[in-house]
Amino acid sequence: LELPHFLILDEMNLSHVERYFADFLSVMESKEEIPMHSGEIENGVPAKLEIPSNLFIIGTVNIDETTYMFSPKVLDRANTIEFRLTTDNLEKYIGSEIKLDMKLLKAQGTNMSDGFMAMALKETDKNLKPSEADLILFFSELKKSGAEFGYRTASEIGRLMYMLKELGESGDNLLDIAIMQKLLPKLHGSRSKLNTALTTLAKFCVKDAVKDFDGKDEDFRKTYFIPFDKLPTDSLAKIKYKISFEKISRMHKNVMENGFTSYAEA
């Protein structure tokens, strides 16, 4: 159990995750063994399967007409990390004269295994006091859209923020990353359902916006729901949760243009 092992599920949503992964999802919290069959060891297969503490599961996801969306049960038990390709990223890749060599990545992380396992197995007490007020705001608004979170998510947010702090993150970045990975992924719906909700959530990401734009949703949208790189310096400086705000802004643009939006499609 000293070395971490990673199970990579490529394009894991080509089938319903909550169906083929149901047994694993059930034991993630209970730490019980997964029942395989009723007998003893049969053809090398044990009657029960224990999920070791050094096993970590990573899944890649694509969203198109051939894939399935995730249920709340799956999202509640996962951290969702979005990777976006920018124009600048693509220009640098195309213009680079260095050939991509995946062999150079082989065994590059072996010296990190001890520290990785130490952090993964560390028992931490959730400390949400610094972010308590904002978490309650997000909970109240997400509940209106049926995307509220529970005790499990709150506890995992506390653990995530602790780990991020251990890795050098600080200040508003801690909750910003947690909002992006743990709260927004469950948000999806129509224009009538999310127009006001996304505006309110965006206000929570901007200092004093709830007070300054009280009853002035349209003014807020005109001021802040513009391309991120075109925001005035003074407006940009007021955004305390920049990653989450940019995502919410993209989701709002999507719902206004297409009548529907979700975290995965924004």
Please place each PLM-identified region on the residue numbering.
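C-terminal regulatory/interaction module of P-loop NTP-utilizing enzymes
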Residues: 1-266
